[in-house]
Regions:
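Glycine-rich anion/phosphate-binding loops
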Residues: 37-43, 89-109, 142-150, 191-193
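Hydrophobic faces of well-ordered beta-strands that scaffold small-molecule active sites
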Residues: 2-8, 27-31, 57-63, 118-122, ...
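N-terminal hydrophobic targeting/anchoring segments and the immediately downstream early-domain regions
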Residues: 1-59, 65-75, 330
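N-terminal small/glycine-rich loop or linker at the start of catalytic domains
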Residues: 1-3, 64-90, 126-136, 165-186, ...
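Preference for extracellular/luminal or secreted protein segments
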Residues: 1-24, 257-330
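Active-site mouth loops of central-metabolism enzymes
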Residues: 3-15, 82-102, 181-193, 251-257
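Glycine-rich, aromatic-flanked loop segments that form ligand/cofactor-binding clefts
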Residues: 52-80, 100-127, 147, 155-171
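Second-shell residues forming the walls of enzyme active-site clefts
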Residues: 34-52, 149-300, 304
Length: 330
């Protein structure tokens, strides 16, 4: 199984994609709006993917709530943006945490019903007023401790539905003044304590995602995704994260180079999984040919994440989630 999670082109699995996945099995797939039209179509696509992917393949979706949502009305619920949860916490911390958990549980329930196993949420980045709005209202708060508490509640709700949450974008995207989808941010500060704290306080999450950002305080040249120093010293070291580490999308313009080379470099730097989302067949094939197989340590982390999700789902009282969904008018 190759150390990559990849996208596909459209709402149906192409014969060329199926053949590629049989020849070079990826660790999983990630689906976007272009792949999701309505529930029956998605069910067919999921069945076709399961038929060609490894038994424990990851089915990932970027379902944060707010403006980042791939499962959308009218077939799936709309969920509040992260900033709304922060405002609720400011008014009433206990209620804010409860609604954060419920939001996570409902996001998780939607993902589980659709056949996904992992969602790229919650966002652990700081809200920084003068930064680029690529994070913006996706951030829970300005206070790192409030972020940590709300993110833990969201992640716990997601986990209660049997879905594996992903904390992102380690070690923090909030200060970036440019959009890493378009160019490479460089954050010139020697004090990253506030940025790192929400990640450190949630270091037991099953997954984290790296940031495509250069922090000269961590590595003067390489973005975190490609930096052994930033990954080993900060994410694995200072933050203390021991779970599955996945890159942000290697198709983003923050990174220069062939996606296949970037994937190989990210794995060599210490990431467990390279994420390549474009859905374009030729570069996806190049990534899957070139990236190594999942390492023994990565395989163990993936297995631990799966087992944790199964335990949380089995311990969740289905009647409780159903009652709370009814209470919310979902």
């Amino acid at each position: 199984m190759k150390a990559a999670v990849v996208g596909i082109a459209g709402p149906a699995l192409l014969p060329e994609e199926a053949a590629l996945f049989r020849a070079f099995p990826p660790a999983g797939v990630i689906l976007f709006g272009r792949n999701i039209a309505e529930p029956a179509q998605l069910a067919r696509l999921m069945a076709d993917l399961r038929a060609v992917l490894p038994a424990h393949a990851v089915f990932m979706v970027d379902q944060e709530g707010g403006r980042v949502a791939r499962l959308r009305p009218p077939y799936w619920r709309a969920h509040p943006r992260a900033r709304t949860l922060g405002h609720l916490f400011d008014s009433n911390p206990r209620a804010g945490l409860r609604i954060a958990w419920l939001t996570g549980a409902l996001i998780g329930a939607d993902c589980a019903e659709a056949g996904f196993t992992v969602t790229a949420a919650p966002v652990l980045d700081l809200s920084v007023p003068d930064a680029h709005d690529v994070i913006g209202d996706r951030a829970l708060a300005e206070d790192p401790v409030v972020i940590a508490r709300l993110a833990r509640a969201v992640a716990a709700g997601i986990g209660a539905a049997g879905i594996q949450p992903v904390g992102k974008h380690a070690p923090g995207h909030g200060r970036a003044r440019v959009d890493s989808h378009l160019s490479l941010p460089r954050v010139e500060t020697n004090d990253l304590a506030a940025d790192i704290r929400p990640f450190a306080l949630n270091s037991d999450l099953p997954w984290m995602m790296t940031a495509h950002i250069v922090f000269p305080a961590l590595d003067p040249i390489l973005p975190v995704t490609l930096s052994p120093r930033a990954i080993g010293g900060t994410i694995r070291g200072h933050i203390g994260f021991k779970g599955v580490l996945v890159t942000d999308d290697l198709a983003m313009k923050a990174l220069d180079g062939r996606p296949a080379d970037l994937a190989q470099q990210a794995i060599a730097a210490g990431c467990d999984i390279a994420l390549y989302c474009s859905g374009e067949l030729a570069p996806t094939e190049a990534v899957l040919r070139q990236v190594p197989v999942v390492s023994p340590a990565g395989a163990e982390r993936l297995a631990t994440a799966r087992a944790g999700a199964a335990r949380r789902r089995l311990s969740m009282n289905p009647a409780l989630l159903a009652a709370e969904r009814e209470w919310l008018g979902a």
